[in-house]
Amino acid sequence: MKLLYVYETRVGTFFIGQSPDGRFHPVFDGESLGSYLSPQHATDDLAGGHTFSPAGGFDTATLGIPEDISEWDTVK
């Protein structure tokens, strides 16, 4: 999976990656939290707490993750 976007939170780093099939995945601690048609859909669901639960069981909606992909940094 190619990591494209990154956002730091108090619990760790989240990424938006793209798999070889062209789908986009919110990723935390190396684990995909879902599969989406666009990076914007991935960040919308991650910010709203509508993805698979990350290891640790915390609610991503409480972390201040922005819905707008333009507020994320690009992976260099």
Residue ranges and their predicted role:
Residues 1-2:
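N-terminal leader/targeting segments and the first structural element of proteins
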Residues 33-76:
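Mixed-charge, Lys/Arg-enriched low-complexity segments
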Residues 6-32:
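Short aromatic-glycine-(Arg/Gly/Cys) micro-motifs in beta-strand/loop hairpins
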